[in-house]
């Protein structure tokens, strides 16, 4: 791995300051955290599958995943309060940059017919979210160890509240966005 954090500090910050015309280096956008989450859906009732999902995310992230629980009971979804409904892990600092580098260099190129990730995942507050359909694109996941194939949502939280600045930051970090037609 070539050190994405050093790349950000030595090259990306300089380019961002020039392109966004920001004089104060403390105002430059930076990546604050990455959240990887999985909603279990129909598998929420089976605790073995929930444990397997959490273990898979832990392998991918390099950090222990937390099983998320329902805050309220919803009769339409047959969910009771306190029931396990998914898993998530929040990455910061070194683990965040290591995961992002692995995602860009190794995992996303393994996606079948990959033409870049959508530019439509920005939320208006400088955060970017996209989904991955299956966990097998990550080299840590062994096919024989998974009980059920599942996707995941990856949210990148930046320090800026502007989508344009967040897009520029992620683009300069090397995130492969789809080309505009």
From Swiss-Prot:
Q: Which sequence ranges form a coiled-coil region, renumbered to this chain?
A: none
Entry-linked InterPro entries? Ribosomal_uL5, Ribosomal_uL5_bac-type, Ribosomal_uL5_C, Ribosomal_uL5_CS, Ribosomal_uL5_dom_sf, Ribosomal_uL5_N
Q: What GO cellular component entries does it have?
A: ribonucleoprotein complex; ribosome
**Keywords for this protein:** Ribonucleoprotein, Ribosomal protein, RNA-binding, rRNA-binding, tRNA-binding
GO terms of biological process kind:
translation
Going by the entry's taxonomy, the superkingdom of the source organism is recorded as Bacteria
In alphabetical order, the GO MF annotations are: rRNA binding; structural constituent of ribosome; tRNA binding
Protein family (similarity comment): Belongs to the universal ribosomal protein uL5 family.
Q: What does this protein do?
A: This is one of the proteins that bind and probably mediate the attachment of the 5S RNA into the large ribosomal subunit, where it forms part of the central protuberance. In the 70S ribosome it contacts protein S13 of the 30S subunit (bridge B1b), connecting the 2 subunits; this bridge is implicated in subunit movement. Contacts the P site tRNA; the 5S rRNA and some of its associated proteins might help stabilize positioning of ribosome-bound tRNAs.
Describe the protein's quaternary organization and the partners it interacts with. Answer: Part of the 50S ribosomal subunit; part of the 5S rRNA/L5/L18/L25 subcomplex. Contacts the 5S rRNA and the P site tRNA. Forms a bridge to the 30S subunit in the 70S ribosome.
Name of the protein this chain belongs to: Large ribosomal subunit protein uL5
Gene of this entry: rplE
């Amino acid at each position: 791995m070539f050190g994405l954090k050093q790349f950000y500090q030595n090259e990306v910050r300089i380019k961002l300051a020039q392109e966004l015309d920001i004089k104060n280096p403390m105002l430059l956008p930076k990546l604050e955290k990455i959240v990887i989450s999985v909603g279990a859906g129909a598998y929420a009732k089976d605790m073995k599958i929930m444990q397997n999902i959490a273990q898979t995310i832990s392998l991918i992230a390099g950090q222990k995943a937390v099983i998320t629980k329902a805050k309220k009971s919803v009769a339409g979804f047959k969910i009771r309060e306190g029931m396990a409904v998914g898993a998530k892990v929040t990455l910061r600092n070194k683990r965040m940059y290591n995961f992002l580098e692995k995602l860009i260099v190794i995992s996303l190129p393994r996606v079948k017919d990959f033409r870049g990730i959508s530019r439509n995942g920005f939320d208006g507050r400088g955060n970017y979210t996209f989904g991955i359909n299956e966990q097998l694109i990550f080299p840590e996941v062994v096919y024989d160890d998974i009980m059920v194939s599942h996707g995941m949502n990856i949210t990148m939280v930046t320090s800026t509240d502007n989508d344009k600045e967040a897009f520029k930051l992620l683009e300069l970090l090397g995130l492969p966005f789809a080309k505009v037609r």
